[in-house]
Amino acid sequence: MKSCLIVDDSKVIRKVARHILETLEFEVEEAGDGEEALSRCETKMPDVVLLDWNMPVMSGMEFLRLLRQRGHSDQPKVVFCTTENDMAHIRAALEAGADEYVMKPFDRETLHIKLQLVGVA
C-alpha cells in the first residue's frame, strides 16, 4: 500500500485529503506544519507528500528545501496543494524540488490525476 503524508495547518483540508486518499487506497499520516513533517519523514519516509505552502512554524517551501537537501535515497514525490496560483509560485515550487502542483480546493478526480502524473497512483 502506498503511503502519503498530508502537511497542512488546516484540520479541514487534512480531513478532506485523508478521505480522498483513503478511497484511493493510500496509508495516510498527517502533519500540521513543515517541522512536524520533517520529523515524520525521519521516522518513516512516505511515498508522496501533499504539501501546503503557508503554514506556521515552517512553511512548505522551507520543508521542501530541507527535505531535498538531506539527500535521502528514498525521496518522496511532493505535490504542493495550495491557493497560491501565480506562475512565480508554481515555478519556485518546481525549482525547489516539487513534482507537481494542485490548486485548493481540489476534488478526488483532480488529486488522483496529479498522483498518477507523479507515478504513485
For each predicted feature, which ranges?
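Charged docking surfaces used in two-component/phosphorelay signaling
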Residues: 15-23
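Short hydrophobic/Thr-rich beta-strand motif most characteristic of the beta2 strand and flanking loop
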Residues: 25-32, 40
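Active-site beta3 strand of CheY-like receiver
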Residues: 44-50
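Receiver (REC) domain active-site loop signature in two-component systems and cognate sites
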Residues: 55
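Alpha4 helix (beta4-alpha4-beta5 surface) of REC/receiver domains from two-component response regulators
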Residues: 62, 85-100, 110
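A Lys-centered signature of the CheY-like receiver
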Residues: 104
